[in-house]
Amino acid sequence: VRLDAVYRRDPDIVFRKISGECILVPIRRRVGDLDNIYTLNETAARIWELIDGRRTLAEIRDALAAEFAVPVQEAERDLLEYLAALRACAAVKEGPA
């Protein structure tokens, strides 16, 4: 994964905050997709918000490091780990919005 890459969210997955929890919900027409609702921690929720089809992964990493007051290496590790999970469930794709 290149840090100069840009990712965009799948428009068929929506982000919701319900009772203090952040979740991703597929809105595709297949009923089986409803079994795939994902609960996000605070960092993962912020990464989802920052993946907008305009920011590079490096820009997202730097924003996370600043917002959560963590070392850049830790922010990068968290970003790449969550990005791998998002790619595995096809919630994001590489390329501009």
Feature map (PLM): residue ranges:
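Long, low-complexity, charged/polar intrinsically disordered regions in eukaryotic proteins
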Residues: V1-V31
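Long, charge-rich, low-complexity alpha-helical segments
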Residues: R30-A97
